[in-house]
Design a protein with these regions (language model features):
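Conserved phosphoryl-transfer catalytic core
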Residues: 343, 352-353, 358-360
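Core catalytic lobe of class I
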Residues: 1-25, 31-336, 342-344
């Protein structure tokens, strides 16, 4: 405390977060490793701050963020949720610069942690899609809660929130741009129905400017493009072009939104016990190494739902690299960083085991 500080001064009421040494972390190897990176055909893992590595990574189809929660969970985590926007800001800025129109962000956090970061994500062009709840069940808090003294309901959940890019063309949303291009052709709106071979679906769905707007499937988009370029005003050609020289193809159009395939039988509540058993990475003494290690099945769930084989997955805050490992199992490319040397070392061992198992097949 400063000798000149007043009893109610901000320097007393709000101190900078202290080190997390001794809080939650069970392994301190204190070893100078002879490596700081690991890679194979699918995965690139780095020891260090992801802010120093983003520029070397391929553009992401998916970003899986499992960083600061505001609970002093690791060295550098904030002491509460209030400082989380400042902690995430440089990362979100970097993600936004690297993202492509089809990028999906899966943002893991506590409810309040996500809530305070959400406005920042919107500011940088990320559109909220859905909030998914990981329900760990009562077993997660069994024997650890005194219901006679607790002043709230016990917490057994985390959130994994889905965001996509708010794609714009010349500062117009996609639905506004589609309508503008058709009007620019000079053709009446009803002719779009002729182009698509429908009664009224084109004008009713593809050109709607409200909540009923429907992203035109590849085939229908190509029909609109071909019709406008064949029958539209010659002075405005090509229509539906990003560069003014060539119209978008159907394949290019399909990449203007994120990928998602909903697996059968799943909802936005994932009832799955906290991680135990062989998958939980432990020290030689048998203690769980990383308190926030995510289950592989949940990581595989979001990766598989929002990517295809050989797509790129970013895991900026690797921990034990669960997202990268899930991506590798699904034949996706993964780029990940972990700033803590001990977590990095143990995380890499998971991949050494995986490679060894593959060699036995």
């Amino acid at each position: 405390m400063s000798p000149n500080a007043e009893p109610n001064s901000p320097s007393i009421l709000k101190r900078k977060a202290s080190s997390t040494v001794g809080r939650g972390k069970v392994a301190n190897l204190n070893t100078n490793f002879n490596f700081s990176a690991w890679s194979d055909e699918y995965v690139t893992l780095n020891l260090g701050d992801s802010l120093q590595h983003y520029d070397n990574w391929e553009q992401p189809t998916v970003i899986i963020s499992d960083g600061a929660y505001g609970i002093l969970g690791f060295e550098g985590d904030t002491s509460d949720h209030i400082d989380l926007p400042n902690w995430y800001q440089p990362h979100i800025e970097a993600w936004s610069k690297a993202a492509i129109p089809s990028t999906t962000l899966w943002f893991w956090n506590s409810e309040i942690g996500w809530a305070v970061v959400h406005p920042l994500l919107e500011k940088y062009g990320w559109r909220y899609v859905n909030s998914n709840i990981w329900n760990k069940g009562k077993g997660h808090i069994a024997g650890n809660v005194n219901t006679q003294k607790i002043r709230r309901f016990p917490v057994v959940t985390e959130v994994c929130v889905q965001y996509v890019r708010e794609v714009t063309v010349n500062e117009l949303t996609l639905k506004a741009w589609l309508l503008q291009e058709w009007k620019r052709s000079g053709l009446p709106l009803r002719r779009a129905n002729d182009a698509c071979g429908v009664v009224d679906a084109a004008t009713r769905k593809y050109f709607d400017q409200g909540h009923l707007w429907y992203f035109p499937p590849t085939e229908m988009f190509e029909r609109l493009v071909n019709y406008a370029n064949e029958y539209g005003s010659p002075q405005g050609k090509p229509y539906f072009s990003l560069d003014g020289n060539q119209s978008l193809t159907g394949q290019e159009w399909s990449k203007m939104r994120s990928k998602f395939r909903c697996p059968h039988g799943f909802t936005n509540v994932w009832a799955r016990p906290a991680l135990r058993g062989n998958e939980r990475v432990k020290t030689i003494s048998g203690k769980a190494l990383h308190l926030n290690q995510k289950p592989l099945d949940l990581m595989k769930l979001v990766v598989e739902a929002s990517t295809d084989e050989n797509d790129v997955v970013w895991e900026p805050f690797g921990g034990l690299f669960s997202a990268a490992l899930a991506a590798r199992k699904l034949k996706r490319k993964a780029f990940s960083c972990e700033i803590d040397p001990d977590y990095f070392y143990y995380g890499v061992q998971r991949f050494n085991q995986e490679v060894h198992q593959d060699s036995l097949l």
